[in-house]
Swiss-Prot record:
Subcellular location: Peroxisome
Keywords associated with the record: FAD, Flavoprotein, Oxidoreductase, Peroxisome
Source taxon at top rank: Eukaryota
EC number: 1.4.3.3
Predominant place of localization: other
Positions contributing to anthranilate binding: Y229, R290
Required cofactor(s): FAD
This protein's encoding gene: DAO1
Catalytic activity: a D-alpha-amino acid + O2 + H2O = a 2-oxocarboxylate + H2O2 + NH4(+); D-alanine + O2 + H2O = pyruvate + H2O2 + NH4(+)
Gene Ontology MF, one: D-amino-acid oxidase activity
Disruption phenotype: Unable to utilize D-alanine as a nitrogen source.
Protein name listed in UniProt: D-amino-acid oxidase
Length: 344
């Protein structure tokens, strides 16, 4: 199937981050092939990455490993932005305000305060009724479809091969030249032969994309029973993403009018400067399936076989849920580190 040394299955954000990580550690781009059923520019419920709101937020877990992934990603994204030609690639930094109806974890606050730009806690006077803690900082914002397309374009230009193919079994991508296969299939890990991870499940989200070029700040309100957010999309002719829902186990790719209205109601309460409901220009309503996993992300090296005395490996990197953009560079870094350590 391929003469490449490394095959990455999946062309979502995790797959592209993994390709970059391999190159960053000295792999020649021509030694990498990305094989995927869906490529940047495609639209499918099973191809999650284009549908994401796409920014760095405080949504992730408070365990040490997750915080490490966040920090690595936040502090290294500027390198990818520079490679892709600057903010116009679909990756820019904008202000963010996040408000919580419960106290924030102290370990997480200690971690993010060390590296988030322009970080500061909100004062009591700044917090609306019901909010007990909040922070402001400068965050990364993605125009997800544009960023994916430009990321792929860059990788292809320097020699990475992209191939459209639906893979039924992970072993099918091994040829004599392949040293390792990186499994970045996201929600596809539930059905991929040779993997079929029963711990993988969808977390459905619905968003509303609205034209509001005057909105240049992220805003979040995290409640115990709902999460509301407004995320500007850089270099998108003024689009913002309003959400959202986190529906575990829901495989539906349909959008629902009552959910749209609920999103808009909550979003306008959170961010009234967006405008009046009857004046909003709705560009799109979309649903996506976050690739979640019981037990969290799977980053693991699995011995596959031995050819001519050389061990070959499958490297799993999936289950990022809704954290792929903001944590995925750190996840890819750990996956490639683990592979090179195993292959010594």
């Amino acid at each position: 199937m391929t003469d490449s040394k490394y095959v990455i299955i999946g062309a979502g954000i995790s797959g592209l981050y993994t390709a970059w990580s391999l190159i960053d550690k000295g792999t020649g781009p021509s030694d990498i092939k990305v094989v995927a059923e869906f490529l940047p520019g495609d639209q499918s419920t099973l191809y999650t990455s284009p549908w994401a709101g796409g920014n760095f937020s405080l949504i992730t877990s408070t365990d040490e490993r997750s915080m490490k992934f966040d920090k690595f990603t936040y502090t290294n994204l500027h390198r990818i932005q520079e490679l892709l030609g600057g903010p116009e690639c679909g990756l820019d930094m904008l202000p963010s305000t996040e408000m919580f109806e419960q106290e924030l974890d102290h370990a997480k606050l200690d971690s993010i305060s060390q590296y988030l730009k322009e970080y500061r806690p909100m004062t009591k006077e700044e917090m609306p009724e019901g909010v007990v803690s909040g922070v402001k900082f400068l965050t990364w914002n993605f125009n997800c479809p544009l960023f994916l397309a430009n990321f792929q374009k860059h990788l292809a230009a320097i020699g990475v091969t992209f191939e459209r193919s639906k893979i039924d079994h992970i072993s099918s991508v091994f040829s004599p030249s392949v040293d390792a296969v990186f499994n970045c299939t996201g929600i596809g890990a539930a059905s991929l032969g040779g993997v079929k991870d029963e711990n993988v499940f969808p977390t459905r989200g619905q968003v509303v994309v609205v034209r509001a070029p005057h909105i240049r700040e992220n805003r979040f309100r995290w409640r115990p029973d709902s999460d509301t957010y407004v995320i500007p999309r850089p270099f998108s002719d003024g689009s913002i993403v309003m959400g959202g829902f986190f529906q575990e186990g829901n495989w539906s790719g349909n959008t629902y009018g009552y959910e749209t209205e609920d999103i808009l109601k909550r979003g306008l309460e959170l961010y009234p400067e967006i405008g009046k409901r009857n004046e909003l220009k709705i560009i799109r309503e979309a649903a996506g399936l976050r690739p979640s996993r019981k037990g969290g992300v799977r980053i693991e090296v699995e011995h596959f076989d031995q050819v001519n005395g050389k061990d070959r490996y499958i490297v799993h990197n999936y289950g990022a849920s809704g954290y792929g953009y903001q944590s995925g560079l750190g996840m890819a870094n750990e996956a490639t580190d683990m592979y090179f350590e195993a292959a010594k």
